[in-house]
Design a protein with these regions (language model features):
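Acidic, low-complexity terminal tails and accessory targeting/binding regions
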Residues: 1-2, 81-92, 139-143, 159-215
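Beta-strand elements within well-structured catalytic alpha/beta cores of enzymes
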Residues: 3-7, 52, 140-149
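Loop-to-helix element that buttresses phosphate recognition and phosphoryl-transfer chemistry
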Residues: 8-61, 112-127
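Short active-site segment of divalent metal-dependent hydrolases/proteases
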Residues: 12, 153-154
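Phosphate-coordination/substrate-recognition cap region in phosphate-metabolizing enzymes
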Residues: 38-101
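Glycine-rich phosphate-binding loop signature in dinucleotide/nucleotide-binding domains
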Residues: 44-47, 133-143
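Active-site signature of alpha/beta-hydrolase-fold catalytic machinery across serine-
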Residues: 65, 156, 160
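Internal catalytic-core helix/loop-beta-alpha segment
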Residues: 100-137
């Protein structure tokens, strides 16, 4: 296969304010839409043979604005289920749990529908996605595979790709509306690019023309 192209969705109101967002299905902000459109030149020269996308609206809209055609909706790409910490910021959690760390402690129990996930459970999902990617790559030759998803999940996916434990995801910071790439060197998994984005000063160029109404 070629490389694995990781794309984090554009900004939402909750990502801007630092709230943990998993199942809450928020749209992109105006800035988030500009970030998504600005991905186009960052992936224009890539030969992408398959796009896998989280079912969340923010991920699907990012893929659409980035020009990624015929994405495959992949439920395992959903964000870490934050359980009782959905919509809560890290600062707020630290008021009652000063030493709390998502990567080692997991989350507080949530509702029956969204009980929360342990780090191990998220790692298992990432492993399933990597298995799906490797299977698909067998018929794609040297084409890249794009994955449009969420910060914490993509960080776990990266850790597992590199042979690290789930907690290794803490080593990788990932901004909204960014592109990262995973590949190989001498047969070993490596990061070939990380957290790429257009400078904020150029994002206005990615705004839609006033005569156009966004879908």
């Amino acid at each position: 296969m070629g490389e694995l192209i990781l794309i984090r969705h554009g900004e939402t109101e909750w990502s801007r304010s630092g709230r943990h967002t998993s199942h809450t299905d928020l749209p992109l902000t105006a800035l988030g839409e500009r970030q998504a459109r600005a991905l186009v030149p960052l992936i224009a020269d890539r030969k992408i043979g398959l796009t896998l996308v989280s079912p969340a609206l923010r991920a699907r809209r990012t893929a659409q604005l980035a020009g990624l055609a015929s994405p495959r909706i992949t439920p395992d790409l959903r964000e870490w289920d934050y359980g009782g910490y959905e919509g809560v910021t890290t600062v707020e959690i630290h008021r009652t749990r000063p030493s709390w760390n998502l990567w080692t402690d997991g989350v507080a129990p949530g509702s029956e529908d969204h009980p929360g996930e342990t780090p191990a459970q998220v790692g298992e999902r990432a492993d399933r996605v990597l298995t799906e990617i490797r299977t698909a790559a067998e018929s794609l030759g040297d084409a890249d595979i794009a994955v449009v998803a969420h910060s914490h999940f993509l960080r776990v996916l990266t850790a597992r790709y590199l042979g690290l434990t789930t907690s290794g995801g803490t080593l990788f910071q990932l901004g909204t509306g960014t592109v990262s790439r995973l590949g190989t060197e001498h047969g070993k998994p490596v990061i070939t690019a990380w957290n790429l984005a257009l400078p904020e000063s150029l994002l206005h160029a990615a705004a839609p023309h006033p005569a156009q109404s966004p879908e």
